[in-house]
């Protein structure tokens, strides 16, 4: 049975404190490697992702619309940051981070606006083909971002963060072979351990074992420390706007124009992944949650994160499901995951900085695999060709844009889905003709009359035949837009020019009101 009422404040926080605290602690362990890895994808120091994970989790626990959902730095949002960070660093070394913080603030403002505009209602109409193309493109991009650590240093462009990672992680063939060996071992642990026990996250076990091997054998391979410094204390307030000499970005229209595309893309892609996660948790827990409240909460969380040196993010599907499977049900689990993460990175930074990048690569490969819509790919030959076309369009546009733009891919997929759906609906309209007597013809119209179907509608009338009287029966049809009105208007006008008396009958009230508003003065004479 689905609960429709909002739980009391006490139940939202303290419904099952023991399970929530334990689950939050386990989730924090799983968040650390991903936050560090996503920082590398975005081209910033690990502490940016870690501070973001802390700020986002704590804030969303307070103002979010879905209990027990985990919000942190994510692959989908990190991939959208790469171009902006690299461009900012190109303007002035180190300035990319300030541009990223400015984009995070604007992202938050957009998401608060989307929440008040009830964007969640519109996102319900995103078809499955678009979602499939989105997650498959995301999976491939996450996998592609691991290439530098594996020695696959393809050139992606002057302002691409993957090239930035390749520059700061130069490794030779000996190190590459060691990295590949550790990655394979890590994958074996991650996929093999759950067959034996699920008491601890297999990703965490893999990281610990690979770190012990790397340190014990004194392997000369890249580690987390290679990417940058880990935080030594709590995040501090920092406003991104100011003097360039102070490492800030100027508060002007040029800065706004630079960060606007990234902020807009992150706000939309982040909410799409968040709403998807929200639907999954609603289904798992047999509850409902408010997506518009969640959208505003995500916006507030991203603004707080950006003001305290963290990157923007969104809900994490994997960690959110992990939290609920471990018994997390209230806001306390989300809050404690963020607090635990911060305590671990501040007190355990000496150990975390020795984690080999190979361990994070193994983790990210498993994330890429779990992100991909493998069932959709397996059933590619069975699903309708229109759905396949939408999925491929979303995937292709994302992969072919530079930098890779998930938001643009989604928009392209939605546009194609709309066109294909319109074509299907257009063919449903039908016009049949009956000869009442020698002096009268009766046309019966059924279906939806709008801008796409008007061609099929017009083809149903023989305007060269002019009996004394023509009746157009619209009782089983509906006019949706100006194009539909214009099409009916055109038929009436041409028959009347030929000398026929035209009468339109059966228009429903909505169609009649629309015709009377924009019919151009032609009276349909409905009865």
What annotation goes with each model-predicted range?
Residues 1-420, 424-429:
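Transmembrane helical cores of multi-pass ion-transport proteins
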Residues 241, 370-523, 527:
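The feature marks cytosolic C-terminal regulatory regions of anion transporters and related permeases
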């Amino acid at each position: 049975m689905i609960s429709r009422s909002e739980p009391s404040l006490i139940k939202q926080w303290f419904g099952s404190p023991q399970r929530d605290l334990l689950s939050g602690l386990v989730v924090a362990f799983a968040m650390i490697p991903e936050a560090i890895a996503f920082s590398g994808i975005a081209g910033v120091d690990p502490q940016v992702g870690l501070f973001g994970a802390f700020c986002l989790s704590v804030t969303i626990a307070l103002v979010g619309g879905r209990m027990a959902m985990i919000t942190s730095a994510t692959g989908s949002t990190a991939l959208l940051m790469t171009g902006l960070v690299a461009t900012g660093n190109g303007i002035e070394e180190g300035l990319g981070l300030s541009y990223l913080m400015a984009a995070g603030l604007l992202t938050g403002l957009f998401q608060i606006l989307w929440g008040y505009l009830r964007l969640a209602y519109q996102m319900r109409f995103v078809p499955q083909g678009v979602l499939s193309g989105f997650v498959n493109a995301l999976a491939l991009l996450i996998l592609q971002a691991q290439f530098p650590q594996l020695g696959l240093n393809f050139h992606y462009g002057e302002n691409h963060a993957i090239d930035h990672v390749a520059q700061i992680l130069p490794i030779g063939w000996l190190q590459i072979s060691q990295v590949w060996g550790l990655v394979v071992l890590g994958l074996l642990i991650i996929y093999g351990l759950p067959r034996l026990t699920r008491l601890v996250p297999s990703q965490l076990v893999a990281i610990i074992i690979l770190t012990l091997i790397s340190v014990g054998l004194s392997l000369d391979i890249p580690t987390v420390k290679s990417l940058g410094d880990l935080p030594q204390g709590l995040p501090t307030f920092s406003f991104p706007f100011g003097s360039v000499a102070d490492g800030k970005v100027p508060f002007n229209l040029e800065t706004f124009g630079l960060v606007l595309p990234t902020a807009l893309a992150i706000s939309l892609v982040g909410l799409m992944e968040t709403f998807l996660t929200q639907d999954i948790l609603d289904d798992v827990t047999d509850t409902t949650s408010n997506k518009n409240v969640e959208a505003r909460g995500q916006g507030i969380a991203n603004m707080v994160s950006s003001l305290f040196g963290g990157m923007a993010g969104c809900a994490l599907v994997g960690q959110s499901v992990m939290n609920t499977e471990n018994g997390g049900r209230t806001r306390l689990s989300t809050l404690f995951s963020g607090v635990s993460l911060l305590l671990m990175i501040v007190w355990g930074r000496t150990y975390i900085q020795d984690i080999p990048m190979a361990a994070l690569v193994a983790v990210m490969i498993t994330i890429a695999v779990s992100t991909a819509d493998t069932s959709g790919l397996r059933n590619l030959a069975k699903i309708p060709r229109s759905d396949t076309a939408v999925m491929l369009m979303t995937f292709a546009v994302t992969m072919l844009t530079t930098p890779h733009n998930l938001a643009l891919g989604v928009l392209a997929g939605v546009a194609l889905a709309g066109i294909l759906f319109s074509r299907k609906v257009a063919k449903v309209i039908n016009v049949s003709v009956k000869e009442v007597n020698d002096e009268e013809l009766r046309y019966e119209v059924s279906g939806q009359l709008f801008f796409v179907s008007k061609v099929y509608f017009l083809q149903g009338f023989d305007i060269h035949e002019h009996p004394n009287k023509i009746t157009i029966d619209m009782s089983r049809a509906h006019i949706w837009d100006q194009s539909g009105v214009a099409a009916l208007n055109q038929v009436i006008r041409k028959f009347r020019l030929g000398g026929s008396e035209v009468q339109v009958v059966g228009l429903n009230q909505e169609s009649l009101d629309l015709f009377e508003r924009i019919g151009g003065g032609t009276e349909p004479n409905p009865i």
